[in-house]
Amino acid sequence: MEAYVLSLSDVLFNILFIGVCILSVLLLISHALKYIIGDSKEKKLFNQRLEQIKNQQPLEPTKYQDIQTICKTLKESYSTNALRHLDARKEVLYCLYRMVLDNKQAISNAIREDLHRDVGMCVAEVNSVIHEINFLRKNLNKYLKRKQVPTVCAQLFGKSFVEREPYGCVCVISPWNFPANLSLIPCAGALACGNTVFLKMSKYSMATSKLIAELCDKYIPSEYLRCEYLTGREAIQECCSASFDYYFFTGSTYVGKLINQAAAEKMVPATLELGGKNPAIVDKSVNLKVAAKRIAWAKSINAGQICVCVDHVFVPRSIKNEFCEAVKNSFIKFFGEDQKKSEDFGRIITKSAAKKMKEIIDQSDVYYGGEVDIENKYVQPTILQNVKIDDLCMKEEIFGPILPVIEYDTLDEVFEMVKQHPNPLACYVFTEDNDMFEHVIANINSGAIYNNDSIVHLLNPNLPFGGNCQSGIGCYHGKYTFDTFSRPRAVCNGHTSFDLSLKDWPFTSFQSWAVDRMAASEIPVVSYL
């Protein structure tokens, strides 16, 4: 039997392969040990903190008249530098993580009580908070540690760094439609960056707002985070007049403008997460049943009360009826023939909002649905046809389970109609033609653009979530949360052991020549000296 002789290259390859495998295993073990040890340390500190908080008297629910005083207290807490070090921030994030994890079911039940939303979506909202907090904990060092950058010749033998600096006391104003996600994720981001936080939650999601305020009082030291949930407009007015260092607002464009004006008067930054009339554009090349199902699903989440929901849809004229029928069948498949009896279909938040939905339906050509029960805040999933750009349903964001279907012949028609409500928070395209998708990208300015699905881009922490102009200012989620709640600060470390006289007066012809040569040579950088 002839022996097989390995060549030198085979031997080297095998050695390299085995070495890489061993190194990978060691790295995995190292990361696991680091996480376990770090988690154990945070857990120990959390238990100590919990014991301290248990001995404290429960705080009285915050009243809007107290906001000015609380803002002052939180600013004083920030000035002590208690959250200056990353370890202190990790401890607070772990407290927040445990708060949500330990009370996951209670928070889910409160959301369901407020919004009549299906159980799965309530749990998914709480899980999204847990995942985001874990992302922040895991990447705190990566994104917030001081980083060295190259140094220019003028700083010869010095060192240059960029560090992320917190703003101070952050005011987070959250809405009712996703009361856990849209309040706790911004709070987690602000705390991760070293800020103290005042959280103004919505009175319309009273069960969730009250529970989260009570849990924050129990789990998070009051010098870092305080909540208010009892009032609406009065509290927002107080927030605008208080001396916060940063505003983070999610809600309507009208209130967003008030927040932005207040921030501008104080010369402090603001992030505004607003909304808009998000279009969907369906192309003939797509699987129509799949596209219709995904649009119907988006329109059904929280009964259409989500800022990234499909607001209206553009469909080629030749397939309009087929598309409408497919959307109708999807609604029936999701919630049955009588959607009012479904435990999974949500309710409109207030009677006045349900009344507004009825006015839209009454002035439209209904293809399917149209039932409204104002007393029970129920609006049936509804499809509108023969829609014109000046109809009531196209005046402003619908924020409900009503889907206007607009026929088109060319994409240029679509682009002209979208210009009536520019810069939507999201634009959804359904096509198998990549050239068509790129054409839409080039012609519609939006916070996000997604082909062949909707909304689920929010689950990706590697993508920014935010609008543009009318749909918002700024973004967050994942690494972008660190960018939002902290600012880059230049840090330069020089010395006196060597003095470069080229910059001193009187300025000689030699200095002019030397400086000119340095500029002309295009080598102004000295890396990491």
From Swiss-Prot:
The record's catalysed reaction(s) read:
an aldehyde + NAD(+) + H2O = a carboxylate + NADH + 2 H(+)
**Which InterPro entries does this chain map to?**
Ald_DH/histidinol_DH, Ald_DH_C, Ald_DH_CS_GLU, Ald_DH_N, Aldehyde_DH_dom, Aldehyde_DH_NAD(P)
Q: Which sequence ranges form a coiled-coil region, renumbered to this chain?
A: none
**Any idea which residues are catalytic in this one?**
273, 307
Please tell me where NAD(+) binds in this chain. Answer: 251-256
Top-level enzyme category = oxidoreductase
Q: Which domain of life is it from?
A: Eukaryota
Any GO BP annotation: aldehyde metabolic process
What's one GO MF term for it? aldehyde dehydrogenase (NAD+) activity
Q: Name one GO cellular component term.
A: cytoplasm
- CDD domains of this UniProt entry? ALDH_F3-13-14_CALDH-like
| EC number, UniProt record | 1.2.1.3
One Pfam family this sequence matches: Aldedh
Family according to the record: Belongs to the aldehyde dehydrogenase family.
Q: What name does the UniProt record give this protein?
A: Aldehyde dehydrogenase 1
Organism, per UniProt? Entamoeba histolytica (strain ATCC 30459 / HM-1:IMSS / ABRM)
